[in-house]
Curated annotation (Swiss-Prot):
GO biological process: mitochondrial translation; ribosomal small subunit biogenesis
Highest taxon listed in the record's lineage: Eukaryota
Function description: Component of the mitochondrial ribosome (mitoribosome), a dedicated translation machinery responsible for the synthesis of mitochondrial genome-encoded proteins, including at least some of the essential transmembrane subunits of the mitochondrial respiratory chain. The mitoribosomes are attached to the mitochondrial inner membrane and translation products are cotranslationally integrated into the membrane.
Name recorded for this polypeptide: Small ribosomal subunit protein uS4m
Source species of the chain: Saccharomyces cerevisiae (strain ATCC 204508 / S288c) (Baker's yeast)
Length: 486
């Protein structure tokens, strides 16, 4: 039987445990070096034994630990001459004092970050959620051998490393606050869109490169640039002589009047709002006027044409057949030639215009810059406020009412109410200080499998046994257990 879990998280005692708990992190943070001065040798050994055993196998009774303790400590010897003649760091043999515990299945689960503590790993094993080499094992003390593969049910790993699932009442209160803040943000964005835009970019720029929000923003910028490149490709693909003439014919169809007067340059600008370059607009107007003089732009025909028919008509005007050429007068032929020449020049201008337009809109992922869009705030919508008294105890109704941009049709942290952890999943807070992967395990977090490669050993300058204590403390603890506590 394991020890009872009494005062494991006590801030007064300040013991460091094998746990990802936030109180344990605080104890680790405030923990100074173990004071071994002004103590007798036995007091030093006793203090070291207390501190190290609080971390290494605190759930094991002292009698059980002394049964498995091995005085022989494992290390490796350098067989080649690579270290000869240079400064060789001392091998910390005494950090191997508790290496025998690393072979246990419950410790291996914790070291592989499949459980948030050794006690939780023990619980997973006893409940039949762990397999070794495909066989269900229910013994936490099972000794792993080199080459053994162990696995845990993925849902259990998500529960162990995930954030706490809020209750329905807690989630509703958070959602109410989120809606108030969102409506405040929308109001500010609609009032001062440029200031809010620049403020958002500044916030992303100040974030560290490893911040998930910044990584998500950078991924958005990559997708944004990819979409712009696709739009640019399609725009350049349609930037041909026939394509430009089809656009002019389409403007004639939409804006053309019943009289025989050609469109003015202002009307042409109205029909082609994407053209901002005055030189290009003037060139297109000249081409249009020449084609209008040729008599090939007949409004009574164009007004009845479908989009596909406009493409065919533009192709015929650019490349008239022999029959059509014979029917044209010399003046019409001259006007067509002049129009085609101007259209050819316009293709170059339009291509440059498109390239420059998309180049200015492209974002720079390295510095997180994004061209301001004056219309961005128009798409933001206010969220209807919710009343907690009306939704209390009625989660399905609450799920339908929540419609925030980042949270649609579910209550905060309860996207899947059946799961025992926060959904959509996110890691528990203060996890990164404990994210230390050992050398003797090969881990796959995608499948929640790990391979026990070999027993942990000591090398020059390092030990593969993870411990918050230094060599002098382990030395006294080893001395204590070497004589069975005498």
């Amino acid at each position: 039987m394991p020890r009872k879990a009494n005062l494991l998280k006590s801030l007064a005692r300040g013991r460091v445990r094998t746990s990802f708990n936030k109180y344990n992190l605080f104890n680790l943070y405030k923990k100074g070096g173990v004071d071994l001065k002004s103590k007798s040798l036995y007091q030093q050994k006793w203090t070291a034994k207390q501190e190290t055993r609080a971390y290494h196998g605190e759930h094991l009774t002292e009698k059980r630990w002394q049964t498995v303790f091995k005085p022989k400590l494992d290390s490796v010897a350098q067989l080649d001459a690579s270290l000869r003649g240079g400064e060789i760091k001392e091998t910390p043999f005494l950090l191997q004092t508790f290496a025998v515990l690393e072979k246990r299945l419950d410790f291996a689960l914790f070291r592989a970050m499949f459980a948030s503590s050794v006690r939780q790993a023990r619980q997973f094993i006893l409940h039949g959620n762990v397999r070794v080499n495909g066989v269900k094992i229910k013994h936490p003390s099972y000794t792993l051998k080199p080459g053994d593969m162990f696995s845990v049910k993925p849902d259990k790993v998500l529960e162990a490393l995930g954030a706490k699932k809020p209750s329905f009442q807690e989630a509703l209160k958070i959602d109410k606050t989120q809606i108030v803040l969102w409506n405040k943000y929308v109001k500010e964005a609609k009032t001062e869109p440029k200031e809010v835009w620049e403020k958002k970019l500044e916030n992303f720029e100040k974030m560290s490169d490893s911040n998930p929000k910044k990584l998500q923003f950078q991924e958005f910028l990559r997708q944004y640039n990819k979409n712009l490149e696709s739009q640019q490709y399609n725009a350049l693909k349609g930037c041909t002589q026939e394509g430009i003439l089809r656009k002019l014919l389409n403007v004639e169809k939409e804006i053309g009047k019943s009289n025989n007067e050609p469109l003015s340059i202002d009307e042409l600008k109205q029909g082609l709002p994407e053209i901002q370059d005055s030189q290009l607009l003037e060139s297109l107007n000249n081409a249009y006027q020449e084609f209008f003089k040729s008599g090939e732009i007949r409004r009574e025909i164009i007004s009845k044409c479908q989009p596909d028919e406009l493409i065919s008509l533009a192709t015929e005007m650019m490349n008239p057949n022999e029959t059509t050429k014979k029917e044209l007068s010399d003046g019409a032929k001259s006007a067509l030639r002049s129009g085609k020449r101007i259209i050819a020049e316009s293709v170059k201008l339009w291509t440059k215009n498109i390239t420059d337009h998309f180049k200015t809109r492209m974002s720079d992922i390295s510095d997180g810059s994004l061209t301001f869009d004056p219309k961005w705030a128009k798409n933001l919508k206010y969220h209807d406020p919710i009343k907690l008294s009306e939704l209390e105890g009625d989660e399905p109704k609450a799920r339908k009412l929540i419609n925030l941009p980042w949270q649609k049709n579910y209550v905060y942290g309860r996207q899947d109410p059946k799961k025992p952890f926060f959904t959509p999943w996110k890691p528990r807070p203060f996890l990164s200080p404990f994210a230390i992967l050992p050398h003797h395990l090969e881990i796959s977090f995608k499948t929640c499998h790990a391979v026990y490669l070999r027993d942990p050993v000591a090398r020059p300058g390092q030990s593969e046994v993870i411990s918050p204590f230094d060599v002098p403390v382990h030395e006294r603890a080893y001395m204590y257990y070497l004589r069975n506590g005498k």
